[in-house]
Amino acid sequence: MKLLAFRRLLRIQRVVVRYRLDDLILELPMLPWWLRLLGAALPWRWLPRRKLELTRGARLRLALQDLGPIFIKFGQILSTRRDLLPDDIANELAWLQDKVPPFPPELAVKRIEEQLGAKIEQVFARFEREPLASASVAQVHAARLKSGEEVVVKVIRPNLEPVIRSDIAWLFILARLAERVSSEARRLHPVEVVSDYEKTIVDELDLLREAANASQLRRNFEGSPLLYVPQVYWDWCRPKVLVMERIYGIPVTDLETLRDQRTDFKALAERGVEIFFTQVFRDSFFHADMHPGNIFVSTRAPWSPQYIAVDCGIVGSLTDEDQDYLARNLIAFFKRDYRKVAQLHIDSGWVPAETKVNDFEAAIRTVCEPIFEKPLKDISFGQVLLRLFQTARRFNMEIQPQLVLLQKTLLNIEGLGRQLYPELDLWATAQPFLERWMRERVSPKQLLRNFQQQVEQVPHLSQMARDTLERLSQPHAHNAPPPEWKSSRHDWLGRLVGAVLLVGAAEVGLGQQLEAWPAWVMLAGGVFLILRR
């Protein structure tokens, strides 16, 4: 492992020199003077070097490509963090392609047999050794099960884990170094960025997780005319092997074939938007890697086109609170109610509670007013979210991984929709959906569901009160962090008092002694006083 790490260090150093990345680093304004002086003294900087006629973004992209698949995927993720990177670098990194030569089919067969505990011919009536596709983490082979179903077999590359561990370790070293030497770099939270990437890449190595994601998404859209997700064959899925139904669709970027079958492009673009908002707000579970390579269009019913989604390795979800704040933010934003947008960011905890709402409102207005001078159909929903996040970052907005995934997915969906139908008015499609969703949040059915959830909290009420009293009785209690239930964005005061009333009502209804009421009223008063402190 140490030898591998040392070799990777030498490789990184050679790539840095080849693409003059040291020049880019030394030009960073956040770099302290002593590190700039140290960098200027590096030995290779005194040697004659040919001039590179490349932009800084192109140099970084080529360097990441040279460093291999793990750095390529890191660059792809960085390209979605436009709240952190300049546009020219983010645009260049978006061109990174996660395509690498396939590994030998003999190794694929060996890994499949090891994972399934059976010979390949015992499981498959046919197995195509030439892969359909190959990427940095896995490659895909076509096959037919003994039972006759046409399937694809996804298999993780062998000997990948040691390389990933080594590369991730170096990324962490570089991120920690950046945080240590520059306060400006600390503001960008590079360690958190690498940590998010580590989670993403580790999750992609577990194909059982991807299978579960695909099953969930398929169930959410069962029978839907909007989206089809291939079936997972669980009997043949393992951590490093995934077997799914093979689909035959048209790549969404193959516009010529879609035209030949007379696809309704307007309906196709609008359905993409509807799928996104359905996943985010109805299901709170969304496919977060919907780039064109993972999206196909069914050949059936081109006048009512249906999407087909594959590769569910990366998904996102939102809490009820995040859903609510996001919907209200978007509606307020398009009504140009910047005060409400600023207040919602503070109320949600996305920016610190001590943020001055007037200053935040003014910053949002300055960034967003020029956007709204365009016709609504020309406004990019994804860019709106991006500018909002960039502004919020200046006010110390904490990284919200789920919102970053959502913004990236929205940019993909919107870009795809405009490619299919340039006149797409995303807001016209989204607004009715959001307003309907907000109305359903206060419908009798939803209120009853919320009421039932309140009842479920009743058994924990007395324990919560005891825990709070015990915490406050401890030395330095006022400096301790609040309990998780108190720091939640819910209005716990209202909930607890409501729960007390429910308990009393339940006791009366069950014929319990009415003398229990004073105790509950006292508890309510005590909790009220505690929470008011």
Swiss-Prot record:
The EC number(s) this enzyme carries: 2.7.-.-
Membrane topology: Multi-pass membrane protein
Keywords: ATP-binding, Cell inner membrane, Cell membrane, Kinase, Membrane, Nucleotide-binding, Transferase, Transmembrane, Transmembrane helix, Ubiquinone biosynthesis
This protein's pathway: Cofactor biosynthesis; ubiquinone biosynthesis [regulation]
Superkingdom of the organism of origin: Bacteria
Cellular component GO terms, alphabetical: plasma membrane
Record GO biological process: regulation of ubiquinone biosynthetic process; ubiquinone biosynthetic process
Ranges of residues in domain Protein kinase: 126-494
Chain segments annotated as transmembrane: 24-44, 510-530
Subcellular location: Cell inner membrane
Top enzyme category: transferase
InterPro entries named in the record: ABC1_dom, Kinase-like_dom_sf, UbiB, UbiB_bact, UbiB_kinase
Chain residues that bind ATP: L132, A133, S134, A135, S136, V137, A138, Q139, V140, K154
UniProt keyword annotation of DNA damage present: no
Subcellular location, principal: membrane
Active site: D289 (proton acceptor)
PANTHER family hit by this protein: CHAPERONE-ACTIVITY OF BC1 COMPLEX CABC1 -RELATED, PROTEIN ACTIVITY OF BC1 COMPLEX KINASE 7, CHLOROPLASTIC
Biological role: Is probably a protein kinase regulator of UbiI activity which is involved in aerobic coenzyme Q (ubiquinone) biosynthesis.
Family to which this protein belongs: Belongs to the ABC1 family. UbiB subfamily.
Record HAMAP family: UbiB (MF_00414)
Record's protein name: Probable protein kinase UbiB
